[in-house]
Design a protein with these regions (language model features):
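Short coil/turn segments that connect the beta-strands within blades of beta-propeller domains
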Residues: 5-6, 51-52, 90-92, 139-141, ...
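Repeated scaffold domains used in trafficking and secretory/extracellular systems
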Residues: 1, 41-46, 80-89, 130-134, ...
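Short loop/turn segments that connect beta-strands within beta-propeller blades
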Residues: 22-26, 66-70, 106-110, 156-159, ...
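Structural motif
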Residues: 18-19, 100-105, 149-153, 215-222, ...
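Conserved beta-strand positions in repeat-built beta-propeller and related beta-rich domains
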Residues: 10-14, 56-60, 95-99, 144-147, ...
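Blade-level signature of beta-propeller repeat domains, shared across WD40, Kelch, NHL, RCC1
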Residues: 244-271
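Loop/turn-rich, solvent-exposed surfaces of beta-rich toroidal or solenoidal domains
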Residues: 185-226
Length: 271
């Protein structure tokens, strides 16, 4: 989910559309329609907004639309398929790919640069799968959040050089979750996620945790101050049990409750 210009944008995979809603979740219009034609979408997996344009990842291409839903064009990704959410900023795409490097920067003409640290695991196959990261653009930085390790990295958007790596494994809740995740033996191409979604608003990074301690929950958000040292400043407790995606504006959180199949608007409540 994204908040942009007093509107909420959400990817509806079942309808193969991007929904545009007001802040009370009234549907204003949709972007794309289900199909395989150039201006249509089939199983979109993620999207991002830069300026007045929406980029949607769909079957190995980025499809572009105006915020009002008019189709603009297509950019082919080639073989470097994203394995998590991507960021789109100033005509460049940023994402993680198990095939071509830890993090990819791709220009509109298809020029690719890889950057960042590749996290190492027991086998090459496990390393390939577990390097997935959420990728976000914020001002002149690219921020990545591992989906299974307590790591946040901040890069200069132009030089792609690392500015900071944050390890938040000392947060009590994260200590408990990681201990449980490590104790479970899974196939090399499977792992327990630590993070289910991320969002940036007003200089703060919001990270939605996957809590598998007694039963699966995704209802706690760690807040990081990215304007200073990017350390955790608070934990937010959401009222439901399992949220899939969310966005933030001011003191409001807009989230999709996966268990209830509903959109919810709530005011921040600190644990």
């Amino acid at each position: 989910m994204k908040y942009c210009g007093n509107r909420i944008y959400a990817c509806c995979m079942g309808r193969s559309q991007i929904l545009c809603m007001d802040d009370e979740f009234e549907l204003l219009h949709t972007i794309g329609r289900k199909g395989r034609a150039a201006g249509e979408l089939m199983d979109p997996s993620s999207f991002d907004i830069d300026g007045d344009t929406v980029a949607v990842l769909c079957y190995g291409v980025f499809k572009h639309y105006t915020l009002d839903g008019e189709f603009v064009g297509v950019t082919d990704i080639g073989l470097s398929l994203p394995n998590k959410d991507f960021a789109w900023s100033n005509g460049r795409y940023f994402y993680t790919s198990g095939d071509q490097g830890p993090i990819i920067s791709m220009s509109a003409d298809g020029t690719i640069r890889s950057f960042g640290e590749r996290y190492r695991f027991g086998t090459e196959e496990e390393t390939r799968y577990r390097n997935a990261r959420f990728t976000l653009a914020y001002r002149d930085r690219i921020i990545t959040v591992s989906d299974n390790l307590p790591y946040i990295e901040i890069f200069d958007r132009q030089t792609l050089k690392s500015e900071r790596k944050v390890d938040y494994s000392d947060v009590d809740l994260v200590v408990q979750i990681m201990k449980k995740n490590v104790s479970e033996r899974l196939a090399v191409n499977q792992y327990r996620a630590l993070v289910t979604d991320c969002n940036i608003s007003d200089g703060r990074l919001y990270v939605l945790l996957a809590d598998n301690l007694d039963k699966f929950r995704a209802n706690k958000i760690i807040v990081f101050d990215i304007e200073h040292d990017c350390r955790p400043v608070s934990i937010l407790q959401l009222p439901g049990e399992r949220y899939f995606s969310f966005c933030v504006n001011g003191q409001n959180i807009y989230a999709f409750n996966l268990r209830e199949n509903t959109f919810e608007k709530m005011t921040m409540c600190y644990e």
